Amino acid sequence: MPVKCCFYRSPTAETMTWSENMDTLLANQAGLDAFRIFLKSEFSEENVEFWLACEDFKKTKNADKIASKAKMIYSEFIEADAPKEINIDFGTRDLISKNIAEPTLKCFDEAQKLIYCLMAKDSFPRFLKSEIYKKLVNSQQVPNHKKWLPFL
């Protein structure tokens, strides 16, 4: 039988942890959903979509799937006039373009880092000041609401 911890964590506390850093936000499904809604309102949801596609891509084991997923990411986010073209520098875009014929699991790493930094420095701080985030925090301030956190 699992032992329950004696500490409480309210939904508000969970929502507040998203403000600690972007990794905490991205690791939480509700936080990720809220961030995506915010980015969509700013017409920049392609950034988090690209980041998520890269995270999924890095888990790919099958060589054929690596090639097909890489081409899909390239055509959706990297190539000129892509439907969800991300804003990366020419050098990074050019390097990916040259390597896409024989992609590796690391072929998008540099672009993913650039997009992560862009979101962390620009979008994430604005999200924390947004009405979307404030409403989430305020709506979850329910008196005497307690949620047990299982230790095991």
Swiss-Prot record:
SMART domains under this entry? RGS (SM00315)
Report whether Ribonucleoprotein shows up as a keyword of the record. no
Gene Ontology cellular-component terms listed = plasma membrane
State if Ion transport is listed as a keyword: no
Q: Which GO terms describe its molecular function?
A: GTPase activity
Q: In which tissues is it expressed?
A: Expressed ubiquitously.
- The segment(s) forming the RGS domain are 21-137
Looking at the Swiss-Prot or TrEMBL record, what is one Pfam family this protein matches? RGS
UniProt keyword list: Signal transduction inhibitor
* UniProt function note: Inhibits signal transduction by increasing the GTPase activity of G protein alpha subunits thereby driving them into their inactive GDP-bound form.
This protein is called Regulator of G-protein signaling 21
